[in-house]
Design a protein with these regions (language model features):
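Hydrophobic alpha-helical topogenic segments used for membrane insertion/localization
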Residues: 7-28
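Conserved Class I S-adenosyl-L-methionine-dependent methyltransferase catalytic core
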Residues: 43, 49-71, 75-76, 104, ...
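Short acidic, hydrophobic short linear motifs in intrinsically disordered regions
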Residues: 83-94
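Conserved beta-strand/loop positions that form the S-adenosyl-L-methionine
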Residues: 223
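Conserved SAM-binding loop of SAM-dependent methyltransferases across substrates and taxa
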Residues: 227-238
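Conserved SAM-binding motif I beta-strand of class I
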Residues: 242-247
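Conserved SAM/SAH-binding beta-strand->alpha-helix loop
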Residues: 249-251
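Conserved SAM-binding loop
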Residues: 256-257
């Protein structure tokens, strides 16, 4: 689709009531330009504004990534696009059990951000969107090696800390507690992928004689074990070794204990 036609359709979607998310995303995409630190001039206000707007646009988009992940919208889109190539807001609303108006808002924002494609020739009353296979793998398939949305789950918690805990922490010098369900889950899910795809098949193979010693016994300490994924994986890989995890987060420890039960 020509860029002018695509822009016109996105504008039509915005006019239909998609709200601040798409407007901010469009402004971010059109106004920001790539800026390298070495190219920033001392008085380059354009570069400074572009960097600010990239950050704002990223925050707005991350919030909608979080919503899509939490409500299973990407998983629903993946299923719909695999079975019918594309989906309407009505389709997504029905499959994901959400309100149609909010499905429309979210899809339009996702199209503006480039995560889904607004198909050409779709009128305002029958907008059709497609989640491409690569994006479906990254956003909606936890078993795929390219799956990579886990860490977005901690973004709202980190932003909330910026509103509440961090200003006082900066003034007082006191720390901020690590314990948070979303943060723990995000890190835990991200680690699970790398344990499965990198640590077990790649890293262990580079440890030489250490692997042999662990196969005969020995002890392993996982400092900052989180939800226990690595502790469990290593215990299974080295059943004769003693594997102990250490963690300060009560939330993460509760997950680890549940997995070990």
């Amino acid at each position: 689709m020509p860029r002018s036609s695509q822009s016109a359709q996105l504008a039509a979607a915005a006019a239909a009531g998609v709200g601040l998310g798409i407007i901010a995303t469009l402004s971010f995409q059109r106004g920001a330009r790539r800026v390298d630190d070495d190219e920033d001039g001392e008085d380059d206000h354009g570069a400074a504004r572009a960097r600010v707007w990239r950050s704002i646009g990223g925050a707005v988009t991350a919030a909608q990534l979080y919503v899509g992940d939490k409500l299973g919208l990407y998983a629903s889109l993946k299923f719909l696009c695999e079975t019918a190539y594309a989906a309407t807001p009505e389709d997504l609303a029905f499959h994901a059990h959400i309100d149609e108006r909010w499905a429309r808002e979210w899809l339009a924002q996702q199209a503006a951000a480039g995560f889904v494609k607004l198909l050409p020739g779709t009128g305002d009353s029958r907008l059709r969107f497609r989640l491409k296979r690569a994006y479906a793998d990254v956003l909606a398939d936890p078993n795929h090696e390219e799956y990579d949305i886990s860490l977005v789950r901690m973004v709202p918690a980190l932003v909330q800390r910026a509103r509440t805990a961090l200003p006082e922490a900066f003034r007082s010098g006191r720390g901020v507690a690590y314990d948070d369900e979303d943060i723990s889950r995000a890190i835990d899910d991200a680690h699970a992928k790398h344990i499965r795809l990198v640590l077990l098949p790649v890293v262990l193979g580079k440890l030489g004689s250490i692997v042999g010693r662990l196969e005969r016994g020995g002890a392993i300490a996982d400092l900052g074990c989180g939800g226990g994924n690595l502790v469990i994986a290593l215990a299974r890989r080295f059943p004769l070794a003693k594997v102990v995890g250490f963690e300060v987060s009560d939330t993460a420890l509760a997950v680890a204990r549940k997995r070990l039960a």
